[in-house]
Amino acid sequence: MLQRIMRKLFIILFLFVCLSANAVEKKTNFSEEIFENAKASGKTIVVNSYEVWCGTCSKQTKILDQAEKEFKDIVFLSYEQSKNKNIAQKLGIKFWTTIVVYKGNDEVARVVGQTDKEIIYAAIQNGI
């Protein structure tokens, strides 16, 4: 009996560790003011919608963090979908694995659920 309880506790602990390892560590940095100013300036903007528990989002975040270091003139903004539904509604983003690229006022690329670095980078380069 005790062995069975210990096994269940171990499984629960293991699942918790696995989920925590995939958690997105990024915080919302989307600001309406920054977004609108970047659009008005004709800058390239990358908007990322995520959830902290989402494994796909975690992979996307790692790729976008790397891209942010490589593309210095691009504005990278992110927000947690469930906590910022107003942003999602304004930008027409329905899913939390969505990356949208703007060039000024124009949306130039949108990818959903993508974790392939080359495809994400190609979307970003559409805004350059």
Where are these regions (language model features)?
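Structural micro-motif
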Residues: 91-100
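N-terminal leader/targeting and pre-domain segments
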Residues: 15, 23-41, 126-128
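Sec-dependent N-terminal signal peptides
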Residues: 9-18
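Thiol-based oxidoreductase modules, predominantly thioredoxin-like and allied folds used
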Residues: 49, 68, 72-85
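Non-catalytic, surface beta->alpha helical segment in thiol-disulfide oxidoreductase systems
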Residues: 103-128
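Short active-site neighborhood of thiol/selenol oxidoreductases, capturing the structured segment around
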Residues: 40-52
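Positively charged n-region of N-terminal signal peptides that target proteins for export
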Residues: 1-9
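Typically the conserved alpha-helix immediately C-terminal to a functionally engaged Cys/Sec
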Residues: 56-70
